Amino acid sequence: MKIDRRLLGRLIVVCLVVTIPIFILSINSFAAQATKKMGDIFGKTNSNQILLDIEAALARAEAKLGIIPQSAADEITRKADVKYLPEEELAKEFKKVGHPMVAIINVWARYMDGNAGEFIHYGATTQDIYDTSYVIQLRAAAGIILNDMREIEASLIDMAKKYRDTPMMGRTLGQHALPITFGMKVGVWIAENRRNMERLKDCLKRLNSGILKGAVGSYAGLGEKGFEIEELLMKELGLAPPDPADWHGVKDNFAEFGNVMALIGMTYGKIGQEIFLLQSTDIGEVEERLPSTAVGSSTMPHKRNPGKSKDLVVLSREIRRHAEVIMDWMVSIHERGQISSADQLEEICLKTDRLLKAAKPLLKDINVFPDVMMENINKTRGLIMSEKLMFVLGEKIGKHTAHEAVRELSMEAFKKKISLKDAVLAKPELAKYLKKEELDEIFDPMKYIGLAPQEVDRVIAATMRLRETDHF
């Protein structure tokens, strides 16, 4: 088959014109990259430094108990710096031995004076060091995440206060239900965000110590002072006393952390989806604040597409998938199965960081259109007040009788495209029970927002009390 090269060239140009802008937009979006601070926590330099810090702390603990010479512990501590792990040497050694920890130990030991290198990693197993390093990294990552969530919480509190009394349509199953206030909707976001913060704080109470129990968790390589060495190591690292049981083959604390990240992700995914939908042309009640120069489409100049809210939905799904993989670590083989991968812990933290960095500007500066909210309330011509009408009529003719009567009125109003109030007035047998002033009040949506404004006050008060307990 003969290929028309001119046509092929045009197709390539079209593909580039369409895909390159999309690629550029995606990498430059607020959610495209994690912050440098979060990235550095899991970067190679910091990861290796943490490993050296743990090994040095182990040496100091063992020296205190007379297990290794103090001079060796001093030298190991003095050389606990990644400058003694040149990348080229490390890569060459890893290629030779095929084991990351052994490669680190071998290269590092060459820089030790005397025989101090012989006492590096004394009695420990690789998983002891790595699992402890993951705890340190996750706790550092959690601090960033909690601070971001707290900052977002403050923005949401301001928003809830501002729109405490702003009526909007409450929707169930995608249909108009009853009026609420926008402040009440934001209050739901505040409460869910705070519950996730408390979950993460609780999780950190358990994810607060490392492990040093040897190859199969029996302390065999550490001897009779194994318990003391482990406890001293955790004290040297500023961690809590160790768990008495081996958890190399369990990983439930990591799984819990992953699931809390998933919950955080899904909360913001829901918020993002809500803003995405409320911004749609057919609803138009809120809008992401965009610069006047923003371009929504390469072919449709009128488009003002939601970007950050979409990012929240996408990232929430990815975070949940990482949590599922981390959960699988719990199904280990015997005492330890080596089926876990630190990459998943790193990725779930980086993506949660990206998600929160997208959420911060979105929720701090969003356009809200109260007039459109009121237009949407009036769109169904009073049908949303059917519940209140039913309760008022129910006092006169009985609740169940009133329910059926109002249901029939609602269907008639919907079919004839008239207001529910007019449908009532067209039925003298029902209208006789209601005075004009009573009817006017029944169909005033502001008179049927329940305790929505007071609910906002209660949510904010409860949240402010919990904010006083934040220490991270």
Predicted features along the sequence, with ranges:
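Bacterial N-terminal signal peptides that target proteins for export
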Residues: 3-15
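Bacterial N-terminal signal peptides
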Residues: 13-24
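A helix-coil-helix interface module used to build multimeric assemblies
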Residues: 27-213, 218-219, 223-232, 236, ...
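Residue-level signal for inorganic ion chemistry
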Residues: 66, 312, 352, 402
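Glycine-rich cofactor-pocket loops
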Residues: 161-183, 285-303, 334-340, 364-384
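A conserved active-site cap/scaffold subdomain adjacent to cofactor or substrate pockets
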Residues: 250-285, 293-349
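Long, amphipathic alpha-helical stalk/connector segments used for oligomerization, subunit docking
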Residues: 318-399
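C-terminal alpha-helical interaction appendages
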Residues: 365-427, 461, 465, 469-471
